[in-house]
């Protein structure tokens, strides 16, 4: 929504500077994009946070995985593709094979039908579900409490929902906002390298992470393992793809979701 608003007003106030997160200025149907020089926008690399979660889940022993998103939009799809890539990397190390069901509910608000779908997945063998978008975390919290399954959420730290929510693949808004404001006030404006430009926030500046409660809720995937994995990804010792389309994943990864992908809507 903010991207649409900014698209319309960004040139109306020539003395106002804008900082936009998680979106870019676009028209209502996403057919046109335009960013004025007084606008700087930041897109998180959700696939990186998703990778951490997928790697942790499989290292912990969960190989029958699910992913439920509100809508099939780039940010949520990046969480899904990163989640699968991390799961694949951990499974390859351990000689395991993972399966992933994906489903996009086409709504931002959880309802009984969505919660029941997750309950059915758990009852049919899915061991861990990652949810992304809206308030799906409320639905998965109900589902794990009824079935004994496990979950990982996204965006914010939702581990207070209970021990069955093993962790959250988060965007570190506080760190990202502080860094951007420091850059702005140091120059007094968005300069030529920032004004009208897109910036990606991720491993490089520590602006995505996996949080897993206090005390740490993973057993096999230790905090030392997490720190090592994070550093290997930050320094590009390990590589990953920034896919925002499930249909363009590398073939070996796409094969694991080909038979399980759902795009039904409730």
Kindly label every feature range from the protein language model:
Residues 1-266:
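A residue-level marker of the well-folded mature domains of exported/periplasmic proteins
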């Amino acid at each position: 929504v903010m991207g649409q608003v900014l698209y319309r007003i960004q040139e109306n106030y020539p003395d106002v500077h804008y900082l936009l997160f998680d979106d870019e200025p676009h028209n209502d149907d996403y057919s046109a994009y335009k960013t004025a020089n007084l606008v700087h926008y930041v897109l998180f690399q959700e696939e990186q946070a998703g990778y951490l979660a997928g790697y942790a889940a499989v290292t912990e022993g969960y190989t029958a995985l699910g992913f439920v998103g509100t809508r099939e939009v780039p940010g949520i799809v990046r969480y899904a593709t990163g989640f699968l890539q991390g799961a694949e990397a951990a499974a390859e190390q351990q000689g395991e094979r993972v399966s992933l069901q994906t489903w996009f509910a086409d709504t931002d608000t959880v309802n009984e039908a969505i919660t029941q779908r997750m309950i059915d997945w758990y009852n049919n063998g899915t061991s861990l579900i990652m949810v992304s978008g809206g308030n799906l975390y409320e639905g998965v919290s109900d589902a794990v409490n009824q079935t004994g399954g496990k979950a990982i959420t996204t965006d914010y730290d939702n581990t207070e929902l209970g021990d069955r929510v093993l962790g959250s693949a988060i965007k570190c808004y506080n760190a990202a906002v502080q860094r951007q404001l420091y850059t702005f006030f140091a120059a007094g404006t968005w300069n030529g390298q920032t004004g009208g430009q897109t910036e990606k926030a991720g491993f490089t500046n520590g602006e995505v992470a996996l949080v897993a409660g206090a005390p740490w809720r993973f057993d096999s995937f230790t905090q030392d393992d997490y720190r090592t994995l994070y550093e290997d990804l930050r320094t590009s010792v390990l590589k990953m793809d920034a896919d925002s389309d499930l249909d363009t994943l590398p073939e070996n990864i796409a094969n694991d979701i080909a038979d399980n992908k759902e795009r039904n809507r409730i």
